[in-house]
Amino acid sequence: MIESITGYLFGIVPFGDIVFGFSEFSIIGFITAVIFTIIVYLTKPEKQLEAQKFKIEDKLEVVTLNELKIRRMMAIVCGIATAGAMLTYDLFDYALFLTLVGIANIGIVSAVKREWVLNASYQYGLIAMIATLPLFGSAGMILAKTGTLSIFELPKIQTSLLFEKIIFAAGMAGETGIAPFYAAKAEMFRAPGSPYILMIHLSSLLLIVRTVEILLTI
């Protein structure tokens, strides 16, 4: 099953309990995250022209230098965490990367001086913190049932992990802010400052695909 999903495995790089695997699937996700991180580092933020209510003239929204530095740094952290999540083949380490991406997503919009953006990020932050319970809880239950968290070893163990997979998927949904939790995150995307905001989309998309690959593998 693992070969049919991930493609050919070129090799692994172990760092103690942390194991990075280089397969066709993981390399594509890793390169995508790295390329977009470089684009974020080199690109200046967009300038938005907002229509004003009961006014003829439009308002030009410009990202200040201090705001730019914070958001660029958090977008780069988000990209690095996403790239790491693409390569790791340890379930606990993947959960750590997933949590770090959720924190970075909040950090990307934390410097925006708009009440509705900060309210949305606060609500998303609450959901992300709650989602860590099923995320790490499912990893703990898998470890207790199988004795390992290695994505290479779990497919070899003949044990039903359906309940643990469902809980892990629920934790991932909360961390990435997809349905049914998208409502708390939607307003964050209206904040000015692309491509930093697009990093939230990209990281969520890559992590969803990676989680599906992991759940089908184990």
Swiss-Prot record:
Transmembrane segments: 19-39, 92-112, 124-144, 161-181, 196-216
Classification via InterPro entries: NiFe-hyd_3_EhaH_prd
Gene Ontology cellular component list: plasma membrane
Keywords: Cell membrane, Membrane, Transmembrane, Transmembrane helix
Localization terms from the record: Cell membrane
Membrane topology: Multi-pass membrane protein
Pfam families: NADHdeh_related
UniProt name for this protein: Uncharacterized protein MJ0522
Species, as recorded: Methanocaldococcus jannaschii (strain ATCC 43067 / DSM 2661 / JAL-1 / JCM 10045 / NBRC 100440) (Methanococcus jannaschii)
